[in-house]
Protein backbone atom coordinates (compact mmCIF):
# COMPACT_ATOMS: atom_id res chain seq x y z
CA UNK A 1 0.00 0.00 0.00
CA UNK A 2 2.77 2.44 0.90
CA UNK A 3 4.63 1.75 -2.34
CA UNK A 4 1.42 2.24 -4.33
CA UNK A 5 0.91 5.60 -2.60
CA UNK A 6 4.46 6.55 -3.61
CA UNK A 7 3.69 5.67 -7.24
CA UNK A 8 0.40 7.59 -7.29
CA UNK A 9 2.01 10.58 -5.58
CA UNK A 10 4.85 10.55 -8.08
CA UNK A 11 2.35 10.53 -10.95
CA UNK A 12 0.52 13.54 -9.48
CA UNK A 13 3.74 15.54 -9.22
CA UNK A 14 4.88 14.45 -12.68
CA UNK A 15 1.66 15.72 -14.25
CA UNK A 16 1.67 18.97 -12.26
CA UNK A 17 5.36 19.74 -12.85
CA UNK A 18 5.81 18.33 -16.35
CA UNK A 19 9.42 18.04 -17.45
CA UNK A 20 10.53 20.80 -15.07
CA UNK A 21 11.05 19.62 -11.50
CA UNK A 22 10.45 23.13 -10.10
CA UNK A 23 8.00 24.96 -12.36
CA UNK A 24 6.74 28.44 -11.52
CA UNK A 25 3.18 27.48 -12.49
CA UNK A 26 1.22 24.24 -12.65
CA UNK A 27 1.59 22.42 -15.96
CA UNK A 28 -1.86 20.84 -15.61
CA UNK A 29 -4.97 21.28 -13.44
CA UNK A 30 -4.83 19.50 -10.09
CA UNK A 31 -8.01 17.55 -10.88
CA UNK A 32 -6.41 16.18 -14.07
CA UNK A 33 -3.31 15.08 -12.17
CA UNK A 34 -5.48 13.41 -9.54
CA UNK A 35 -7.62 11.58 -12.12
CA UNK A 36 -4.53 10.27 -13.92
CA UNK A 37 -3.14 9.10 -10.57
CA UNK A 38 -6.46 7.34 -9.91
CA UNK A 39 -6.20 5.46 -13.20
CA UNK A 40 -2.58 4.46 -12.53
CA UNK A 41 -3.30 3.38 -8.93
CA UNK A 42 -6.34 1.37 -10.05
CA UNK A 43 -4.23 -0.35 -12.70
CA UNK A 44 -1.70 -1.40 -10.07
CA UNK A 45 -4.61 -2.48 -7.88
CA UNK A 46 -5.92 -4.52 -10.80
CA UNK A 47 -2.46 -6.07 -11.18
CA UNK A 48 -2.55 -7.26 -7.57
CA UNK A 49 -6.18 -8.32 -8.02
CA UNK A 50 -5.32 -10.51 -11.00
CA UNK A 51 -2.52 -12.22 -9.07
CA UNK A 52 -4.73 -12.88 -6.05
CA UNK A 53 -8.11 -13.56 -7.64
CA UNK A 54 -7.25 -15.26 -10.92
CA UNK A 55 -3.83 -16.80 -10.29
CA UNK A 56 -4.71 -17.73 -6.68
CA UNK A 57 -1.48 -16.31 -5.27
CA UNK A 58 -1.53 -15.56 -1.55
CA UNK A 59 -2.33 -11.85 -1.03
CA UNK A 60 0.75 -11.34 1.15
CA UNK A 61 3.01 -12.74 -1.58
CA UNK A 62 1.25 -10.95 -4.44
CA UNK A 63 1.38 -7.53 -2.82
CA UNK A 64 5.01 -8.11 -1.82
CA UNK A 65 5.95 -7.67 -5.49
CA UNK A 66 4.71 -4.08 -5.58
CA UNK A 67 5.98 -3.51 -2.04
CA UNK A 68 9.48 -4.35 -3.24
CA UNK A 69 9.50 -2.57 -6.60
CA UNK A 70 6.97 0.22 -6.07
CA UNK A 71 9.24 2.92 -4.67
CA UNK A 72 11.78 2.35 -7.44
CA UNK A 73 8.98 2.77 -9.97
CA UNK A 74 7.91 5.99 -8.23
CA UNK A 75 11.46 7.37 -8.47
CA UNK A 76 11.73 6.31 -12.12
CA UNK A 77 8.53 8.23 -13.02
CA UNK A 78 10.25 11.51 -12.08
CA UNK A 79 13.72 10.48 -13.26
CA UNK A 80 14.80 10.14 -9.63
CA UNK A 81 14.28 13.88 -9.11
CA UNK A 82 12.30 15.50 -6.29
CA UNK A 83 9.75 17.77 -7.98
CA UNK A 84 8.39 20.71 -6.00
CA UNK A 85 5.02 22.37 -6.59
CA UNK A 86 5.15 26.08 -5.83
CA UNK A 87 1.43 26.77 -6.24
CA UNK A 88 -0.01 27.33 -2.71
CA UNK A 89 -3.41 25.97 -3.78
CA UNK A 90 -1.97 22.47 -3.99
CA UNK A 91 -0.96 22.51 -0.32
CA UNK A 92 -4.60 23.00 0.73
CA UNK A 93 -5.34 19.28 0.21
CA UNK A 94 -2.82 18.22 2.84
CA UNK A 95 -3.05 21.23 5.11
CA UNK A 96 -5.58 23.93 5.81
CA UNK A 97 -7.83 26.04 3.63
CA UNK A 98 -7.49 29.69 4.71
CA UNK A 99 -10.23 30.62 7.14
CA UNK A 100 -11.09 27.00 8.04
CA UNK A 101 -9.53 25.73 11.31
CA UNK A 102 -10.14 22.05 10.53
CA UNK A 103 -7.52 20.26 8.37
CA UNK A 104 -8.64 19.51 4.83
CA UNK A 105 -7.66 15.79 5.09
CA UNK A 106 -10.39 15.43 7.73
CA UNK A 107 -13.05 16.47 5.21
CA UNK A 108 -11.55 14.27 2.51
CA UNK A 109 -11.43 11.26 4.84
CA UNK A 110 -14.99 11.89 6.03
CA UNK A 111 -16.25 12.07 2.44
CA UNK A 112 -14.44 8.83 1.51
CA UNK A 113 -15.79 7.02 4.57
CA UNK A 114 -19.32 8.20 3.82
CA UNK A 115 -19.17 7.09 0.18
CA UNK A 116 -17.71 3.67 1.02
CA UNK A 117 -20.21 3.21 3.86
CA UNK A 118 -23.15 3.97 1.55
CA UNK A 119 -21.81 1.62 -1.12
CA UNK A 120 -21.23 -1.24 1.29
CA UNK A 121 -24.44 -0.68 3.25
CA UNK A 122 -26.97 0.00 0.51
CA UNK A 123 -25.62 -1.83 -2.53
CA UNK A 124 -25.17 -5.49 -3.30
CA UNK A 125 -21.40 -5.01 -3.48
CA UNK A 126 -21.14 -4.77 0.31
CA UNK A 127 -23.22 -7.91 0.81
CA UNK A 128 -21.28 -9.82 -1.84
CA UNK A 129 -17.93 -8.74 -0.40
CA UNK A 130 -18.81 -9.92 3.09
CA UNK A 131 -20.27 -13.14 1.71
CA UNK A 132 -17.06 -13.96 -0.16
CA UNK A 133 -15.00 -13.10 2.91
CA UNK A 134 -17.07 -15.37 5.16
CA UNK A 135 -17.22 -18.39 2.86
CA UNK A 136 -15.98 -18.23 -0.71
CA UNK A 137 -17.21 -21.70 -1.67
CA UNK A 138 -20.69 -21.06 -0.31
CA UNK A 139 -20.85 -17.75 -2.20
CA UNK A 140 -19.93 -19.53 -5.40
CA UNK A 141 -22.66 -22.11 -4.88
CA UNK A 142 -25.15 -19.26 -4.44
CA UNK A 143 -24.34 -17.84 -7.86
CA UNK A 144 -21.76 -15.20 -6.95
CA UNK A 145 -18.45 -14.72 -8.72
CA UNK A 146 -15.86 -14.60 -5.91
CA UNK A 147 -12.99 -14.15 -8.35
CA UNK A 148 -14.39 -10.95 -9.84
CA UNK A 149 -15.46 -9.59 -6.44
CA UNK A 150 -11.95 -10.01 -5.04
CA UNK A 151 -10.49 -8.43 -8.17
CA UNK A 152 -12.88 -5.48 -7.88
CA UNK A 153 -11.91 -5.01 -4.23
CA UNK A 154 -8.28 -4.48 -5.20
CA UNK A 155 -9.30 -2.00 -7.91
CA UNK A 156 -11.31 0.03 -5.37
CA UNK A 157 -8.31 -0.09 -3.04
CA UNK A 158 -6.30 1.52 -5.83
CA UNK A 159 -8.75 4.42 -5.92
CA UNK A 160 -8.35 4.92 -2.16
CA UNK A 161 -4.58 4.82 -2.60
CA UNK A 162 -4.78 7.73 -5.07
CA UNK A 163 -6.72 9.81 -2.53
CA UNK A 164 -4.11 9.07 0.15
CA UNK A 165 -1.33 9.97 -2.29
CA UNK A 166 -2.91 13.35 -3.02
CA UNK A 167 -2.99 14.17 0.69
CA UNK A 168 0.55 12.92 1.31
CA UNK A 169 2.30 14.80 -1.50
CA UNK A 170 0.32 18.00 -0.99
CA UNK A 171 1.53 18.28 2.61
CA UNK A 172 5.08 18.95 1.47
CA UNK A 173 4.27 19.92 -2.13
CA UNK A 174 6.94 17.34 -2.95
CA UNK A 175 7.76 13.68 -2.34
CA UNK A 176 10.39 11.53 -0.67
CA UNK A 177 10.18 8.17 -2.39
CA UNK A 178 11.75 6.16 0.42
CA UNK A 179 9.77 7.73 3.27
CA UNK A 180 6.28 8.54 2.00
CA UNK A 181 3.65 6.26 3.60
CA UNK A 182 6.41 4.05 5.02
CA UNK A 183 5.10 1.16 7.17
CA UNK A 184 1.51 2.28 6.59
CA UNK A 185 0.63 -1.37 5.96
CA UNK A 186 1.25 -2.16 9.62
CA UNK A 187 -0.97 0.73 10.68
CA UNK A 188 -3.76 -0.58 8.46
CA UNK A 189 -3.51 -4.08 9.96
CA UNK A 190 -3.47 -2.64 13.47
CA UNK A 191 -6.50 -0.44 12.79
CA UNK A 192 -8.53 -3.40 11.52
CA UNK A 193 -7.45 -5.66 14.38
CA UNK A 194 -8.05 -3.04 17.07
CA UNK A 195 -11.51 -2.50 15.60
CA UNK A 196 -12.34 -6.11 16.40
CA UNK A 197 -12.57 -7.14 12.75
CA UNK A 198 -11.39 -10.54 11.63
CA UNK A 199 -8.09 -10.49 9.77
CA UNK A 200 -9.21 -13.55 7.82
CA UNK A 201 -12.15 -11.72 6.22
CA UNK A 202 -15.92 -11.78 6.58
CA UNK A 203 -18.11 -9.31 8.42
CA UNK A 204 -16.54 -6.02 9.36
CA UNK A 205 -17.28 -2.84 11.26
CA UNK A 206 -16.07 0.30 9.50
CA UNK A 207 -16.67 2.57 12.49
CA UNK A 208 -14.57 0.27 14.69
CA UNK A 209 -11.74 0.29 12.13
CA UNK A 210 -11.79 4.09 12.04
CA UNK A 211 -11.62 4.14 15.83
CA UNK A 212 -8.71 1.70 15.59
CA UNK A 213 -6.93 4.09 13.22
CA UNK A 214 -7.29 6.92 15.74
CA UNK A 215 -5.92 4.64 18.47
CA UNK A 216 -2.88 3.91 16.28
CA UNK A 217 -2.33 7.61 15.74
CA UNK A 218 -2.65 8.18 19.48
CA UNK A 219 -0.10 5.41 20.10
CA UNK A 220 2.30 6.95 17.58
CA UNK A 221 1.95 10.43 19.07
CA UNK A 222 2.44 9.06 22.59
CA UNK A 223 5.61 7.20 21.60
CA UNK A 224 6.99 10.37 20.04
CA UNK A 225 6.12 12.19 23.26
CA UNK A 226 8.36 9.75 25.13
CA UNK A 227 11.21 10.53 22.71
CA UNK A 228 10.99 7.20 20.89
CA UNK A 229 12.90 7.41 17.60
CA UNK A 230 10.88 7.05 14.41
CA UNK A 231 13.00 4.07 13.35
CA UNK A 232 11.96 2.23 16.52
CA UNK A 233 8.21 2.79 16.08
CA UNK A 234 7.64 -0.29 13.87
CA UNK A 235 9.10 -2.51 16.60
CA UNK A 236 6.54 -1.31 19.15
CA UNK A 237 3.73 -1.61 16.62
CA UNK A 238 4.90 -5.10 15.66
CA UNK A 239 4.54 -6.23 19.27
CA UNK A 240 0.96 -4.93 19.31
CA UNK A 241 0.22 -6.69 16.00
CA UNK A 242 1.55 -10.01 17.30
CA UNK A 243 -0.54 -9.75 20.47
CA UNK A 244 -3.70 -8.87 18.54
CA UNK A 245 -3.21 -11.63 15.97
CA UNK A 246 -2.58 -14.24 18.67
CA UNK A 247 -5.59 -13.09 20.70
CA UNK A 248 -7.81 -13.23 17.61
CA UNK A 249 -7.02 -16.88 16.83
CA UNK A 250 -9.89 -19.35 17.48
CA UNK A 251 -7.81 -21.47 19.86
CA UNK A 252 -6.93 -18.54 22.12
CA UNK A 253 -10.52 -17.29 22.04
CA UNK A 254 -11.77 -20.73 23.06
CA UNK A 255 -9.25 -20.83 25.89
CA UNK A 256 -10.21 -17.36 27.11
CA UNK A 257 -13.89 -18.29 26.92
CA UNK A 258 -13.26 -21.46 28.95
CA UNK A 259 -11.31 -19.49 31.57
CA UNK A 260 -14.13 -16.95 31.75
CA UNK A 261 -16.71 -19.67 32.30
CA UNK A 262 -14.64 -21.28 35.05
CA UNK A 263 -14.23 -17.96 36.84
CA UNK A 264 -17.95 -17.32 36.56
CA UNK A 265 -18.77 -20.79 37.92
CA UNK A 266 -16.37 -20.41 40.85
CA UNK A 267 -17.88 -17.02 41.66
CA UNK A 268 -21.38 -18.52 41.59
CA UNK A 269 -20.33 -21.38 43.88
CA UNK A 270 -18.83 -18.95 46.40
CA UNK A 271 -22.00 -16.85 46.40
CA UNK A 272 -24.18 -19.95 46.95
CA UNK A 273 -21.84 -21.24 49.67
Predicted features by range, described:
Residues 1-46:
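Membrane-embedded helix boundary and interhelical linker motif in transport proteins
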Residues 3-7, 31-39, 61, 106-111, ...:
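Hydrophobic alpha-helical transmembrane segments
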Residues 9-11, 38-41, 67-72, 108-118, ...:
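Hydrophobic core segments of alpha-helical transmembrane domains in multi-pass membrane transport
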Residues 16-18, 25-26, 42-85, 119-124, ...:
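Short loop segments and helix-boundary regions at transmembrane helix junctions
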Residues 29-37, 44-48, 99-176:
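Helix-loop-helix "hairpin" substructures at the membrane interface of multi-pass membrane proteins
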Residues 31, 55, 59-122, 149-152, ...:
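Transmembrane helix-bundle core of multi-pass membrane transporters
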Residues 141-148, 219, 223-273:
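Cytosolic-side transmembrane-helix boundaries in multi-pass membrane proteins
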Residues 161, 172, 176-238:
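Transmembrane alpha-helical segments in multi-pass inner-membrane proteins
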Amino acid sequence: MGAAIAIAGSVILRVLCGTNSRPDTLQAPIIVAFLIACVVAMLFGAFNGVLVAYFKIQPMVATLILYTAGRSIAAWINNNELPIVSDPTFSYFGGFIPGIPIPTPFFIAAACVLVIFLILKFTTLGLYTQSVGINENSSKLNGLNPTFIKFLTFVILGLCVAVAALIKVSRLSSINYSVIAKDIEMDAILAVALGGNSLSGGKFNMAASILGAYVIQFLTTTLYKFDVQSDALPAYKAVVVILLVVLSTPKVREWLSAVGKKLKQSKTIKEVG
